[in-house]
Amino acid sequence: MTGFRDQLGVHAQALVLRETRNNLLTSNIANAATPHYKARDIDFGAELARASGNGTLRTTEARHFAAGGPAARGEALYRDPVTPSLDGNTVEMAVEQMEFAENTLRYQTSLALLNRRISGLMTAIKGE
């Protein structure tokens, strides 16, 4: 017998990570004119793998590098700008807006899939 969390799949975890990413992206956009502000983001794929328990790195050779960078610890990463500004700000508005739009669309998709999954579970519980 599987648990309720198992029935929801990765969509519940994806929603939490998408919300975190949305907060970082909106912070980047809000600080576009702040001198020396560094744009931040998360590696969504790595974070989702870590949250779902698939993020453990298996080394098969003693000479492999150890995994312990910021992304492995769930920290926000700094984004390198394509065209750095003179005031040290790394926010590129076009990039941030595009990333925000894509993240929002994917959030809505995960929410719709999660709603459909919950609806199916409710139907099964009611015996319809």
Curated annotation (Swiss-Prot):
Keywords: Bacterial flagellum. Signal peptide: none annotated. GO terms for biological process: bacterial-type flagellum-dependent swarming motility. InterPro entries: Flagellar_basal_body_rod_CS (IPR019776), FlgB (IPR006300). One of its GO terms (cellular component) is bacterial-type flagellum basal body, rod. Structural component of flagellum, the bacterial motility apparatus. Part of the rod structure of flagellar basal body. PANTHER family: FLAGELLAR BASAL BODY ROD PROTEIN FLGB, FLAGELLAR PROTEIN. Belongs to the flagella basal body rod proteins family. The basal body constitutes a major portion of the flagellar organelle and consists of a number of rings mounted on a central rod. In Gram-negative bacteria, at least four rings, L, P, S and M are present, whereas Gram-positive bacteria lack the L and P rings. The rod consists of about 26 subunits of FlgG in the distal portion, and FlgB, FlgC and FlgF build up the proximal portion of the rod with about 6 subunits each. This is Flagellar basal body rod protein FlgB. It comes from Cereibacter sphaeroides (strain ATCC 17023 / DSM 158 / JCM 6121 / CCUG 31486 / LMG 2827 / NBRC 12203 / NCIMB 8253 / ATH 2.4.1.) (Rhodobacter sphaeroides).
